[in-house]
Regions:
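Beta/alpha (TIM)-barrel catalytic core signal, keyed to glycine-rich beta->alpha loops juxtaposed to Asp/Glu
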Residues: 1-180
Length: 181
């Protein structure tokens, strides 16, 4: 935290932020930086429908308590929360590269959960990607979400999530049920 404070004070950075810290670590980082006079303004955790660790591990609570912004990365779970993998692993996809996405993880049970999520998205008038982004952004502690795209139309699709209708309680319950299957 001292290095972050030094970077801000010396003009090398405009603000301090952290990434991938757990709940307790987030609270401690915020406390230390505040004591140094350099508030921690942003946290960047991995967060999506398939990886809810920031909820269960207290990260979102710590962010809210500290008044930090939150910009999650991988809100589409490296493309899993799109329709791309519903029929299997397409040629040229991340899963074929085996670097960041394990093809063995894209099994029939996962595809069934993704298909169920896709049906919920369709009922909302959205693509699965749009719903997944809207789901991440539903929490007021989330400032924005980092997306990646390999084609312009993917960005256009993701941007539409900004105008998504709010989730009804029944929709959130259906999402939780689909994910638990």
């Amino acid at each position: 935290m001292g290095a972050l404070d030094t970077a801000v004070r010396s003009g090398r950075a405009l603000y301090a932020g952290i990434s991938n810290y757990g709940g307790a670590q987030t609270r401690e980082a915020a406390r230390i930086l505040k004591a140094l006079g350099t508030p921690c303004l942003i946290h960047q955790p991995r967060y999506n429908m398939l990886d809810r660790a920031p909820e269960t591990g207290g990260v979102l609570d710590a962010i809210g308590e500290a008044g930090m912004g939150c910009i999650p990365f991988s809100p589409l779970a490296q493309g899993l929360l799109t329709e791309r993998y519903l029929g299997g692993i397409p040629d040229g996809s991340r899963a074929t590269q085996g670097k960041w996405l394990d093809p063995k993880a894209i099994d029939a049970p996962l595809r069934a959960r993704l298909t169920a999520l896709g049906a919920i998205a369709k009922a909302r008038g959205q693509t699965l990607a749009q719903m997944a982004l809207a789901w991440v952004l539903r929490d007021p502690r989330i400032t924005s979400a980092l997306i990646g795209a390999s084609r312009p139309e993917q960005i256009e699709d993701c941007v539409r999530a900004a105008n998504a209708p709010k989730f009804a309680a029944a929709e959130l319950a259906a999402i939780d049920k689909a994910l638990a299957a």
